[in-house]
Amino acid sequence: MHSLAPLDYAIIIGYLGLSLIMGVLMTRRASSGLDHYFLGGRTLPWYLLGVAGMANWFDLTGTMLITSFLYMLGPRGYFIEFRGGAVLILAFMLVYTGKWHRRSGCMTGAEWTIYRFGESKVSEVVRVLGAAMTILTAVMMLAYLIRGASLFLGMFFPWPPLYTTLVLVTVTTLYTMSSGFYGVVLTDLVQGIIVIASCLVIAFLAWNMIPDTASLAATALQVTGNPNWTNSHPEWHTPMPAGYEAYSPLIMMMSFYFVRHFIGGLGTGGEARYFGARSDRDCGLQSLQQGVMIMFRWPLMIGFAIMGIYLVHSLYPDPVILQRAADLIHTYSPQTTAAFWHDLTSSIINAPAKYPPELIGQLQALLGPDWQGKLPLVGFQGTVNPEQILPAVLMNMVPTGLKGMLVVAMFAAMMSCKNGMVNGASAFFVKDVYQNLFRPKAANRELIFASYASTLGIVIVGFYFGVAATSINNLWGWIIMSLMAGQLAPGVLRLYWWRCNAWGCIGGTVLGGIGAVLQRSLYPQMPETTQFLFMTVLSFVGTIGGSLLTQPTPMPVLKHFYRTTRPFGWWRPLRQEFQGAERAAVDRENRSDMIAVPFTLLWQITLFLLPMQLVIKSYQAFFCTLPLFLIGVTGMYFFWWRPLMRREAGTATAT
């Protein structure tokens, strides 16, 4: 059995210990008030908020999942991640949705609901429903992270993956409970430095392994069966292994995911880092920084995919061995499901004495004396488990010391994403459920303890669902295409349509949320495209129908929202709120923002693609993509950056 060296373990233990110490040191400052605990007192500079935003997208499970698609498809796997991993919604936050939400002065998205719809019993229901759906989404996202962590940790530690994951989750939960948003941002800064350094190291190691693009393409063809592995442009149809056939019509799936996130991006911006920003400029700058920092993730993942190609080629020159190994394990353990396949193989590897000697002997004869190092890559269906490529590369192809640092980097990615997510969900529970419904006059100390309890509860429930998940890809697809799609309409329409009211948001949230949960319970194998279409229609029908069948939001509330947020869209009854030069300035800002969005999307898409083309030494494709990147940068400068700086200069002069 491969295992980490003592130096690697020392690095990992030292990192986790340092994280706990930092959390304890931040406790006093974070506990001075809810504003400090959840938003850092609204005093954190944009570059620290940008690091925190980057960490929310740089998670361990997502990195493993995207690496699996890049392993199967090469750079074209990037286009499948238009469903989430490419962070297309960031373009909308960068240009305008982040600053729209900051202008409210609220602490959470549910609190923002009162700002948008006014003080009423119906608005309170919307606020609580919004908090409930946010907490549910956080729980399922946490389950997704925990499932990925168990796959990762089972490769490195001689204990059941469930227990090692529990230890890591416990450490990160204690840290999040004690340090609040200050600690989230502080560790995100440290972890961001570790992760980016690791990205550069892995990208260089992979680049150095490739003799040339043609040689890589030939090896990839032998390993994956994909004849166009080094291509960067999507195709109408591409071969996919068993279990992933739904992604074969690549252009159709890419287009579908793009439309889904274009719609979803219209309703973004309600994250804590935007509520906590000091100005409109800081909202844009932190988003820009997030995009640049997330870019480093892609050479890391294509690097792992390349090294995985060479690793599988050396370990399994004959793919038939994989099928025979899986069949052998199924024979001795026919009751094992896909959800617990990894736990079974990890147990066989770490405790072979617990299993029949005949099974161990046949595995050794089939896989060779190093059978324990090869078995983790054997998937449930008798093919390479692509979700295990990343930990397999770390275990087999990275030297001691550096291996420990890279494992720490993956821990850091998981901790950063989990900490920010749990902190945000806890804020919703304490502010919008506990204090709002049960203890409106609760003292600060009581509310801080309520945040501790809610953090613990969210983690426990997320851990339970994570253990039961069959696949990180399956769970991620449901979260994005069903659960979140069922909440699209209330989030979008309330920003752009004056007639959208609290009843409409209730209708859209309830119909979409119930639909997503029922779909997962009754039809878990429903295709992602069908999930999205069905839940989106339910959400829009509920929101539009509920709004039109009830009274509109009181005009004074709408006027206050419109005047402070200054949105574009269907706001004709409110346009008279701005007159003359002020009206012209608002229209000019909105027009620039709308034009800037497609340029920002072009910039972001090409920004992530360019470094992957460099790593695989596809220089011709790189120089074809570069002009598109420069067009995006130019458009952003003229339609986003220059107008933003002019407005900031005008505000400074006026004050």
Specify the residue positions occupied by each region the protein language model found.
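Membrane-embedded helix-loop-helix hairpins and adjacent transmembrane boundary segments
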Residues: 1-655
